[in-house]
Regions:
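…; additionally, a secondary subgroup of soluble metalloenzymes is captured
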Residues: 1-302
């Protein structure tokens, strides 16, 4: 599977942004219970499948002339000690408004029972980063006033962190300040709807944070790097597919694999294509010309 972008143009025709990235919807279903899946992957906690859980993430909002842009977490270099310090400052406010204790603190992700915020419509940082946050802020769904309550808590934390020594030290080192808190992924494990193809998978490959929790939920072994000696009945979420295509091509030609199913998301829509060894060398219409090998560039551009 290769990551795709949301159908943003289609979304702009509506009042609300697209719900989730296509790969998020493909793996987890339309309810998008990202937070409990991340929690399952990052901790040894026994996660209640019927408990709505939220993911809170310390972030940097970059100010332009007329709007704010959410930076990706990979761009802010938040350390474990900084994460602990920032949570300690914000914890009383978070737990008071959520009416729950924080369940688990990772370096980048904090998890808590969603409580009164369970009905919020949210978007992951993967989807919202690099964009004007006005359109991607949490919205009310079936309960009015919840988004306003979140903005109040968010503003309180922003003021606390603005004067926090963590940000003073980061500024001295030339790092972006941690100036806001993002909420996303609200849902229950019971809401997961995995694709049928995972029913026959014996191994999951990839380093996306969602995979560790999803593999644990499905009781399927998972590892970050692909073991090319173990490719049959496997699922891989690949960031740089061009870097492994030659290995996969060799596995098909060597009959180590019968077929490869490529899943991608052109214009936000799920596309499945199956390739066998017969597809690897397409004969030109000019029969006297040598057949050309199927490259990843040809696959992804078709």
């Amino acid at each position: 599977m290769v990551s795709g972008e949301d159908a943003i143009d289609a979304g702009l025709e509506r009042d609300t942004p697209p719900s989730g990235l296509p790969q998020e919807r493909f793996l987890l279903g339309d309810q998008l219970p990202i937070a409990p899946v991340l929690l399952l992957g990052q901790s040894d906690l026994a996660v209640n499948p019927n408990e709505a859980i939220a993911c809170l993430q310390p972030v940097h909002l970059h100010a332009t002339r007329d709007h704010l842009i959410l930076m990706a977490q990979s761009q802010i270099d938040l350390t474990a000690s900084e994460s602990v310090s920032l949570l300690q400052v914000a914890l009383p406010f978070i737990e008071e408004d959520f009416r729950n204790k924080v369940l688990f603190q990772g370096q980048r992700d904090w998890f808590i029972s969603a409580g009164p915020f369970a009905s919020l419509a949210t978007h992951s940082i993967d989807q919202a980063h690099g964009r004007n946050i006005d359109w991607w802020m949490p919205r009310d769904t079936n309960v009015t006033g919840v988004a306003k309550l979140w903005r109040k808590l968010q503003n309180e934390i922003q003021m606390l962190w603005h004067i926090d020594p963590v940000n003073q030290e980061r500024e001295q080192r030339g790092y972006p300040s941690i100036n806001s808190l993002w909420i996303s992924g609200i849902g229950k494990l019971a809401d997961i709807q995995t694709p049928p193809l995972l029913e026959n998978v014996d191994q999951i490959y990839g380093d996306h944070p969602l995979l560790a929790g999803l593999a644990k939920y499905l009781a399927i072994p998972q590892q970050r790097e692909i073991d090319f000696s173990n490719l049959q009945n496997t699922f891989a979420w690949i960031d740089r597919p061009e870097s492994i295509w030659d290995n996969l091509r060799a596995a098909l030609l060597g009959n180590e694999l019968d077929e490869i199913e490529v899943i991608d998301f052109p214009k936000g829509q799920t596309r499945h294509r199956i390739f066998t060894s017969k597809d690897l060398n397409k004969q030109s219409w000019a029969f006297w010309k040598k057949s050309e090998p199927l490259t990843w560039q040809k696959i992804i551009s078709s």
